[in-house]
Amino acid sequence: STAAGGKVNPGKNGAHIGIASDIIINNEGEKHFIYKDKKKIFTSPAFNFDEVSELPKNAILLSSDKVNNVMGVSFNAGNSKIIGLQYHPDYEYSQMLKLIDGRKERLFKSKNFLNEEEYESHISYIKSQNELLDFNNRTCEVRNWINYIRN
């Protein structure tokens, strides 16, 4: 977003640490090819501490959640059509769990987790979401993007 004139700041409502829950596709998002056949509300692997605080000119907001107002956005930059996602349909929760484990000390230092119980609860939540995973829905954006660039 910043390269196209938008602004990014540290997230005011927290961070996505391995998971973004209840991402909601808005009306514009429902019309966009990236969300074709995607459930309107979904959970996805995610890992970020920042948020888009100002969209680039002509940007279209596609999806949001309680942590970040901008979870999906589309805009043009020169001759390029840009789709920005603040989550990872291309990753698995197992990869997110490894990232969390590798950053555990840093996450405690920055007070993302206040104690071991809170940390373990978060890990359990991610594992429970993995059990509920609908692979086709989770990877929908990747498929839609590949189909788009093929045509």
Where are these predicted regions, by residue range?
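Cysteine-nucleophile active-site neighborhood
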Residues: 1-29
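Amide-donor transfer/coupling interface in amidating biosynthetic enzymes
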Residues: 25-151
